[in-house]
Amino acid sequence: MNILSIETSCDETSCAVTQNGKKVLSNVVFSQIKDHQIFGGVVPEIASRKHIQFMTLVLQQALKEANLTPQEIDLVAVTQGPGLVGSLLVGINAANVFAYTYQKPLLGVNHLLGHIYSAQIEHEINFPALVLLVSGGHTDLFYLTDHLQIKPLGTTLDDAVGEVYDKIAKNLNLPYPGGPLIDQLAQQGKDTYHLVRPYLKNDNLNFSFSGLKSTLVNLVMKQNLKDINIPDL
């Protein structure tokens, strides 16, 4: 079975073609990083416009790299949420048009399930399984007893880890996206600043990162940024 998958939940236009659920025939991604860098984060209106601009090109390239015609696609899958509404609509509309034009079945997918099941491309998931899902807009802990039998154990009560990285990077005058560079700098630093370690003494499995973000932002505001050795943070 050849599946065409379309993902536009945030700021990347992506189409992939997989065969029998395992073999990736193509995976084409148009990144908008440069378009959002000057703002230090994703601007929803810009994201949706860029999806409109590049959706058709990305889809055509995915089919080309997979060496398949539209008629050879057996199923169309598309992210239906969660995500930015304007961005999601572009992908959903493209999937609907493709499915209607070529008379293919259409499947809407929760993109968090996409994150979870991407692990299965290389390794089978052995149940029961514990999943820590960390992405740009989500930080969640799930317990899986079987396929699609998912119990939420915990989630962030405020900011997702990815959001915290980007907001902190902006306050430190670091480029967007902040995560990769902050990770690199952290490898070089010393444990000089003892920042708050959030939400450790609680009887649940939720997360909270707003306190850590606020502590660092306040530290930067109180001191001259030039006097702070960023890797030590």
Curated annotation (Swiss-Prot):
Binding site for substrate: L133, V134, S135, G136, G137, D166, G179, D183
Substrates-to-products reaction catalysed: L-threonylcarbamoyladenylate + adenosine(37) in tRNA = N(6)-L-threonylcarbamoyladenosine(37) in tRNA + AMP + H(+)
GO BP term, pick one: tRNA threonylcarbamoyladenosine modification
Gene Ontology MF annotations: metal ion binding; N(6)-L-threonylcarbamoyladenine synthase activity
GO (cellular component) term, any one: cytoplasm
EC assignment: 2.3.1.234
Function, as annotated: Required for the formation of a threonylcarbamoyl group on adenosine at position 37 (t(6)A37) in tRNAs that read codons beginning with adenine. Is involved in the transfer of the threonylcarbamoyl moiety of threonylcarbamoyl-AMP (TC-AMP) to the N6 group of A37, together with TsaE and TsaB. TsaD likely plays a direct catalytic role in this reaction.
Family under the similarity heading: Belongs to the KAE1 / TsaD family.
Protein name: tRNA N6-adenosine threonylcarbamoyltransferase
Encoding gene, per UniProt annotation: tsaD
